[in-house]
């Protein structure tokens, strides 16, 4: 083997791009909220290629992972480093979503002008090639710049890309959509601890499985990762956890779209429970469906394994809207029991709610959110705009019908209206989104959720922190909370091409002055909530608090959720019949007669 000092260096930059805010500045933070699992997957795969010396014994691959949500990307500097290395290197933009594609192209344009090989992969490329009969302008623009496109997953295939890049023979398109790899025993995701440290709470990620069996029309996962699920084994997960814990990382986001439908969930949870018994304690955030509480032992074992927070795709409380989106697996009669079960185990629930289904109006939206506030014991409600994302059935149908869709991909972030609605103008729809956040995150309801937590739910201080964070994300940043972080970074020269470069005096005064005012108001709000919560915790009657949402059973005849529409009434009536049938079949206990002595 050649001496390490004499080996050639191949510089591999793996970049997870961010996207632009409404003023054209890259959304970036000192510490970001969530990690990028795509970046972790590619880093792990690239490390394996490095260890296997896929470019030959005389070549050392140096890998530089960059998450732009917490690290500034300087394309000119990257180009200079690769040029100084004799042009021997490559930049891969990984996990690029549709809203991140314009930013990736803007960076790639600079790199390509310097002759740097560039590959872009992710859900936008994969979704477009999977669902559209013709390549859209966005992909053709990339190809015209000499950028290579990668569709599909990289396990077992990335060495081909590296070899082609090293040889200067990158193909225009690498398409592995119809050859998805198995995950058991595959190289797992990994991020160096110094990169993980750039996230709030030192949180890393991994996927225990990919693919989803459901048919939601707004979803891209089923058309990119497939409807046939693939899984990692308990051994794989144990190895991932052990290597991270050895490096000081104990908090993980398991990114499976629906962990409850991972057939290995029980063996994985059992293994994590064993690790905890050995003193290896980790915490997890997971995503599940609305029927996971019906799976025997699922919630109990999830909690025993270390699950603390749960994302649930509630999406809507109108059965007609759910049916229109092919979300037929969601039954509104399951919602209360599901949420109460997670609450009983002191887990924080995050629930997604989509705005823009066919029956939605501003008035109906406010009505439904107020019903949720009163009748469902959830903690965090996350709003998103129904968006025809490239790669989804909704987008493919819209394109086929010639529907007017916004051409600016930067808006495809689930926060901006990108097409027309049957009952609202685009402006009204956008205002409905803002109205949703204002309606749910009122000081009064924030206190109600904390009261429920103090009365026997998840940790009240964590709930108070999260509620304040979500409230602040909308009120001060107008950014989806999970895209926010701690201390906003804005760089004057990192503005979207075509937008003017601001005067330095104006820019820095506005940026830093705004930071001071914003954080002052956030801290004031948090202090008020925190002090109020401490007083509440000292109240001996606080543990006895109850309200309609904390009822242990549904009142199908009187709850407003079951009176909204005819479909809702039918759902309530059906659930009531099932409950009555269960009670009728329940064995009647015989009276116990004590023996007479």
Question: Regions from the language model: what does each represent?
Answer:
Residues 2-14, 83-88, 110, 416-597:
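Radical SAM enzyme core and accessory elements
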Residues 21-22, 125-131, 157-158, 214, ...:
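Flexible glycine/acidic-rich beta-alpha junction loops that bind and position SAM and/or redox cofactors
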Residues 53-56, 111-116, 274-281, 345-346, ...:
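Short helix-capping segments at alpha-helix termini
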